[in-house]
Amino acid sequence: MELLEEDLTCPICCSLFDDPRVLPCSHNFCKKCLEGLLEGNVRNSLWRPSPFKCPTCRKETSATGVNSLQVNYSLKGIVEKYNKIKISPKMPVCKEHLGQPLNIFCVTDMQLICGVCATRGSHTKHVFSSIEDAYTQERDAFEFLFQSFETWRRGDALSRLDTLETNKRKSLQLLTKDSDKVKEFFEKLQHTLDQKKNEILSDFETMKLAVMQTYDPEINKLNSILQEQRMAFNIAEAFKDVSEPIIFLQQMQEFREKIKVIKETPLPPSNLPTSPLMKNFDTSQWEDIKLVDVDKLSLPQDTGVLTSRSPWHPCLLLMAVVLLGLLVFFGPTVFLEWSPLEELATWKDCLSSFNSYLTKSADFVEQSVFYWEQMTDGLFVFSERVKNVSLVALNNVAEFVCKYKLL
């Protein structure tokens, strides 16, 4: 098609021929293109018009006007047919048979085929139809298929889309609600942590105040004593060089009294006892605290800042020894009410009888049920007796403690 278009193109305007005219030299040009050349030739020749020369071969032509030139009807018809072919859609070709147009419709396989496919290919003995009939039939089928597809799209896809969007919206709402709960939880947790931190720091401030109240009076006493010592030293410095006996004796008496008062004033202890809380406090013991128990964080309990408690009181140790002695004393008397040997003998007889029945296969099932019930009843009685013995022993111990006021 491209080569044909080159032959149908005017050399002057480089477009398809429009009303082509042929020169005596057999070259073709558009009518409008030749008119333009003739007008230019007339303007350039003022006195006498020069002969017209062919733009292609430069051969002179004695034509006086374009209308006198012959119309090339054959070329004009070819150009018109070419324009129609160029405007019409391009026919597809067969992929199996190169260059063969798909101009037949196979009704059996519902597809376009070429002539080779219909006669010698895989579509032999199939039902065929013309392109026009197939177009009409497939057009009706398209309308039905399109309507059913539209119904399916609206009935299934759109409904699922609505469902997905609804579920998405609900899921986002739930996530937002849960995130708000998480935010509220951590805000409460942070509030609890801040509150607990302030409580513990407040306890430290209270202990600091107690330490100041304990140490400040002793420090003030020592400062007063040091002040008295400085005054005594100043008195000694003032009269050590006095040579008058009366004045020296007076100053000596005052110095001796000052020294006596200083020596009689007791000095406060320098190693005041420290609270166990202040010695043993360590935040590493809080590392095992869980978040749910964060409200239970507290400082170790201490009755006073400057008092310490021994881990074992002598009275508690004595009480433990007494309770152990009571158990040793009252235990045998309690167990006299119940004989374990008799109970074991009864169990031995039951097991011996049960063993004798093991050799009798016929009675084994029936007797095993009976002895199993006997065993469970015996265990229940045994547990009840142990419980009663324990209660009696504890009751005797409690009466002894209350009687002698050990607690």
Swiss-Prot record:
Q: Which intervals of the chain form a coiled coil?
A: 172-200
Residues in RING-type zinc fingers run 10-58
- The EC class name is transferase
GO molecular function annotations of the record: transcription coactivator activity; ubiquitin protein ligase activity; ubiquitin-like protein ligase activity; ubiquitin-protein transferase activity; zinc ion binding
Q: In which pathway does it act?
A: Protein modification; protein ubiquitination
User: In residue numbers, where are the B box-type zinc fingers?
Assistant: 89-131
Alphabetical GO CC annotations of the entry are: cytoplasm; endoplasmic reticulum membrane; perinuclear endoplasmic reticulum
Q: Which reaction does it catalyse?
A: S-ubiquitinyl-[E2 ubiquitin-conjugating enzyme]-L-cysteine + [acceptor protein]-L-lysine = [E2 ubiquitin-conjugating enzyme]-L-cysteine + N(6)-ubiquitinyl-[acceptor protein]-L-lysine
Q: How is it modified after translation?
A: Auto-ubiquitinated; requires the RING-type zinc finger. Auto-polyubiquitination leads to proteasomal degradation.
Keyword set for this entry? Coiled coil, Endoplasmic reticulum, Immunity, Innate immunity, Membrane, Metal-binding, Transferase, Transmembrane, Transmembrane helix, Ubl conjugation, Ubl conjugation pathway, Zinc, Zinc-finger
Query: CDD domains under this entry?
Result: Bbox2_TRIM13_C-XI, RING-HC_TRIM13_C-V
Transmembrane ranges, per UniProt, are 316-336
Q: Where in the cell is it found?
A: Endoplasmic reticulum membrane
What Gene Ontology terms for biological process does this UniProt record contain?
ERAD pathway; innate immune response; negative regulation of viral transcription; positive regulation of canonical NF-kappaB signal transduction; positive regulation of macroautophagy; proteasome-mediated ubiquitin-dependent protein catabolic process; protein autoubiquitination; suppression of viral release by host
Keyword Transmembrane recorded: yes
- List the InterPro entries: TRIM/RBCC, Znf-RING_euk, Znf_B-box, Znf_RING, Znf_RING/FYVE/PHD, Znf_RING_CS
Query: Quick one: which residues bind Zn(2+)?
Result: 94, 97, 117, 123
UniProt membrane topology term: Single-pass membrane protein
A Pfam family assignment: zf-B_box
Q: What is its EC number?
A: 2.3.2.27
Signal sequence extent: none
Protein function: Endoplasmic reticulum (ER) membrane anchored E3 ligase involved in the retrotranslocation and turnover of membrane and secretory proteins from the ER through a set of processes named ER-associated degradation (ERAD). This process acts on misfolded proteins as well as in the regulated degradation of correctly folded proteins. Enhances ionizing radiation-induced p53/TP53 stability and apoptosis via ubiquitinating MDM2 and AKT1 and decreasing AKT1 kinase activity through MDM2 and AKT1 proteasomal degradation. Regulates ER stress-induced autophagy, and may act as a tumor suppressor.
How does this polypeptide assemble, per the annotation? Answer: Interacts (via C-terminal domain) with VCP. Interacts with AKT1; the interaction ubiquitinates AKT1 and leads to its proteasomal degradation. Interacts with MDM2; the interaction ubiquitinates AKT1 and leads to its proteasomal degradation. Interacts with p62/SQSTM1. Interacts with TRAF6. Interacts with IKBKG/NEMO.
Q: What is known of its domains?
A: The coiled-coil domain is required for the induction of autophagy during endoplasmic reticulum (ER) stress. The RING-type zinc finger is required for auto-polyubiquitination.
- In Swiss-Prot or TrEMBL terms, this protein is called E3 ubiquitin-protein ligase TRIM13
Origin species, per record, is Rattus norvegicus
Gene label: Trim13
